[in-house]
Regions:
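Short, small-residue-biased leader/transition segments that mark boundaries at the very start
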Residues: 2-9
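Short hydrophobic/aromatic-rich motifs at helix boundaries and adjacent loops
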Residues: 5, 29-31, 68-69
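Non-catalytic terminal extensions of PLP-dependent enzymes
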Residues: 11-12, 35-182
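A structural-propensity feature for long, helix-poor, extended segments
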Residues: 14-17
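PLP-dependent aminotransferase class I/II
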Residues: 19-32
Length: 182
């Protein structure tokens, strides 16, 4: 029996082993697989779900967080945490790190660049209402923590295998290669 890359190379159903020479070809294969899996009816439904999910979350959060663009959105919405930072010292980075402590992958931070303390939230089309509600609840809880115990968020994440790194130190003194132990 064949294992690993041997199976890819020798299996007549396979496209073969992928090499870096082909650039983003694997991304195209994944996209094609996604399109073929969803089909003609599934693509519009997935798109509608992405838009619905983003608008649902945005409307559940806009009473606390400042929306950069407070109007119906497409598949993403942008929050500005500039007011929260001025009031509490908690940045978009702190909220993102707090999300990690709660088992949620953080949204895109500091983009778009024209929005101060931006968090760009893109809930995917496959998220259930329950997971969206959980994310909203966590974001609301983090806002409350920002107002009552900012230091807790400045220390986050504390439950992940790798805790918050010294970003200034990492930028000024980069460690770019691993030293193997003999």
């Amino acid at each position: 029996s064949l294992v690993g890359s041997e199976m890819c190379i020798r299996d007549r159903q396979s496209i073969g082993e992928m090499k870096s020479f082909y650039g983003n070809f694997t991304v195209i294969v994944k996209a094609l697989t996604y399109v073929k899996t969803l089909g003609r009816e599934g693509i519009p439904e997935a798109s509608q779900n992405a838009v619905l999910n983003a608008n649902y979350m945005m409307n559940k959060l806009k009473d606390l967080y400042t929306m950069a663009y407070d109007e119906v959105c497409m598949h993403e919405f942008v929050m500005s945490l500039a007011d929260l930072k001025k009031k509490t010292g908690i940045s978009a980075m702190d909220i993102a790190k707090g999300l990690l402590d709660n088992g949620i992958h953080p949204p895109t931070m500091y983009f778009p660049l024209i929005v101060e303390e931006a968090l760009m939230v893109e809930p995917t089309e496959t998220e259930s209402k329950e997971t969206l509600d959980e994310a909203v609840e966590v974001l609301r809880k983090l806002y409350e923590i920002a107002e009552t115990d900012a230091e807790q968020l400045h220390q986050a994440p504390v439950t992940t295998p790798v805790t918050r790194m010294d970003e200034v130190g990492a930028a000024r003194h980069p460690y770019l290669r691993y030293e193997w132990q003999d």
